[in-house]
Protein backbone atom coordinates (compact mmCIF):
# COMPACT_ATOMS: atom_id res chain seq x y z
CA UNK A 1 0.00 0.00 0.00
CA UNK A 2 1.35 3.41 -0.89
CA UNK A 3 1.44 6.31 1.51
CA UNK A 4 3.00 9.65 2.24
CA UNK A 5 5.89 10.45 4.52
CA UNK A 6 5.50 13.46 6.80
CA UNK A 7 8.02 15.05 9.15
CA UNK A 8 6.70 16.90 12.17
CA UNK A 9 9.48 18.44 14.28
CA UNK A 10 11.99 15.59 14.55
CA UNK A 11 9.50 12.73 14.42
CA UNK A 12 8.69 11.04 11.14
CA UNK A 13 5.15 9.78 10.55
CA UNK A 14 3.88 7.54 7.76
CA UNK A 15 0.32 8.23 6.67
CA UNK A 16 -1.23 5.34 4.75
CA UNK A 17 -3.53 6.28 1.92
CA UNK A 18 -7.01 4.81 2.08
CA UNK A 19 -7.32 2.43 -0.85
CA UNK A 20 -10.85 1.19 -0.31
CA UNK A 21 -13.87 1.68 -2.54
CA UNK A 22 -16.05 4.66 -1.59
CA UNK A 23 -19.10 2.43 -1.16
CA UNK A 24 -17.26 0.28 1.39
CA UNK A 25 -16.17 3.35 3.34
CA UNK A 26 -19.72 4.76 3.25
CA UNK A 27 -21.13 1.44 4.51
CA UNK A 28 -18.63 1.34 7.40
CA UNK A 29 -19.49 4.91 8.37
CA UNK A 30 -23.22 4.15 8.21
CA UNK A 31 -22.75 1.08 10.43
CA UNK A 32 -20.88 3.19 12.97
CA UNK A 33 -23.63 5.86 12.91
CA UNK A 34 -26.25 3.18 13.57
CA UNK A 35 -24.13 1.60 16.31
CA UNK A 36 -23.53 4.88 18.13
CA UNK A 37 -27.09 6.17 17.79
CA UNK A 38 -28.57 2.89 19.08
CA UNK A 39 -26.24 3.05 22.09
CA UNK A 40 -27.22 6.66 22.76
CA UNK A 41 -30.91 5.72 22.64
CA UNK A 42 -30.48 2.68 24.90
CA UNK A 43 -28.01 4.08 27.43
CA UNK A 44 -28.60 7.85 27.45
CA UNK A 45 -32.36 8.06 26.79
CA UNK A 46 -32.43 11.30 24.76
CA UNK A 47 -35.46 13.11 23.39
CA UNK A 48 -33.77 13.70 20.01
CA UNK A 49 -30.60 12.85 18.07
CA UNK A 50 -29.49 14.78 15.00
CA UNK A 51 -26.50 13.76 12.89
CA UNK A 52 -24.79 16.77 11.32
CA UNK A 53 -21.58 17.62 9.52
CA UNK A 54 -19.92 15.69 6.70
CA UNK A 55 -21.60 12.36 7.54
CA UNK A 56 -25.08 13.91 7.34
CA UNK A 57 -24.18 15.44 3.98
CA UNK A 58 -22.84 12.16 2.61
CA UNK A 59 -19.33 13.62 2.37
CA UNK A 60 -17.60 11.73 5.17
CA UNK A 61 -14.15 10.27 4.55
CA UNK A 62 -12.16 7.76 6.61
CA UNK A 63 -10.59 10.73 8.42
CA UNK A 64 -13.95 12.34 9.26
CA UNK A 65 -15.49 12.38 12.69
CA UNK A 66 -19.18 11.92 13.43
CA UNK A 67 -21.12 14.88 14.81
CA UNK A 68 -24.20 14.27 16.96
CA UNK A 69 -26.49 16.88 18.47
CA UNK A 70 -28.45 15.38 21.35
CA UNK A 71 -31.39 16.88 23.21
CA UNK A 72 -32.01 15.47 26.69
CA UNK A 73 -33.96 16.72 29.68
CA UNK A 74 -31.93 15.59 32.66
CA UNK A 75 -28.33 16.54 31.95
CA UNK A 76 -25.62 18.12 34.10
CA UNK A 77 -25.51 21.91 34.18
CA UNK A 78 -22.06 22.28 32.60
CA UNK A 79 -21.51 21.29 28.98
CA UNK A 80 -18.21 19.51 29.68
CA UNK A 81 -19.94 17.33 32.29
CA UNK A 82 -22.62 16.43 29.75
CA UNK A 83 -20.04 15.34 27.20
CA UNK A 84 -18.05 13.40 29.79
CA UNK A 85 -21.18 11.59 30.98
CA UNK A 86 -22.16 10.63 27.44
CA UNK A 87 -18.63 9.70 26.33
CA UNK A 88 -18.30 7.19 29.18
CA UNK A 89 -21.42 5.36 28.02
CA UNK A 90 -20.75 5.05 24.30
CA UNK A 91 -18.35 2.54 22.70
CA UNK A 92 -17.10 3.74 19.34
CA UNK A 93 -14.49 2.98 16.69
CA UNK A 94 -14.35 6.46 15.17
CA UNK A 95 -13.86 10.01 16.42
CA UNK A 96 -17.13 11.51 17.64
CA UNK A 97 -18.23 15.00 18.69
CA UNK A 98 -21.31 15.36 20.87
CA UNK A 99 -23.31 18.54 21.46
CA UNK A 100 -25.84 18.11 24.25
CA UNK A 101 -28.65 20.58 24.96
CA UNK A 102 -31.60 20.57 27.31
CA UNK A 103 -34.90 21.10 25.43
CA UNK A 104 -35.34 24.62 26.85
CA UNK A 105 -31.76 25.58 25.85
CA UNK A 106 -32.33 24.25 22.34
CA UNK A 107 -35.58 26.21 21.94
CA UNK A 108 -34.06 29.39 23.36
CA UNK A 109 -31.04 29.23 21.02
CA UNK A 110 -33.31 28.64 18.02
CA UNK A 111 -35.52 31.60 19.00
CA UNK A 112 -32.39 33.76 19.26
CA UNK A 113 -31.58 32.76 15.68
CA UNK A 114 -28.39 30.81 16.40
CA UNK A 115 -26.96 30.34 12.87
CA UNK A 116 -25.05 27.16 13.77
CA UNK A 117 -28.15 25.42 15.14
CA UNK A 118 -30.20 26.63 12.17
CA UNK A 119 -27.62 25.06 9.85
CA UNK A 120 -27.80 21.80 11.80
CA UNK A 121 -31.58 21.79 11.38
CA UNK A 122 -31.28 22.58 7.68
CA UNK A 123 -28.53 20.10 6.77
CA UNK A 124 -28.67 17.55 9.58
CA UNK A 125 -30.46 14.21 9.67
CA UNK A 126 -32.83 13.43 12.51
CA UNK A 127 -31.92 9.94 13.69
CA UNK A 128 -34.28 9.77 16.65
CA UNK A 129 -37.15 11.73 18.15
Regions found by a protein language model. Give the residues of each.
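Catalytic core of pol beta-like nucleotidyltransferases
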Residues: 2-48, 56-63, 72-129
Amino acid sequence: MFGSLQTIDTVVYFKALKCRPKIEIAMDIQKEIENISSQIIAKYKPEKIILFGSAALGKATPESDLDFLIIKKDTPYYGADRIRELSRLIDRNIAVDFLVYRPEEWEQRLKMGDPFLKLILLEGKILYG
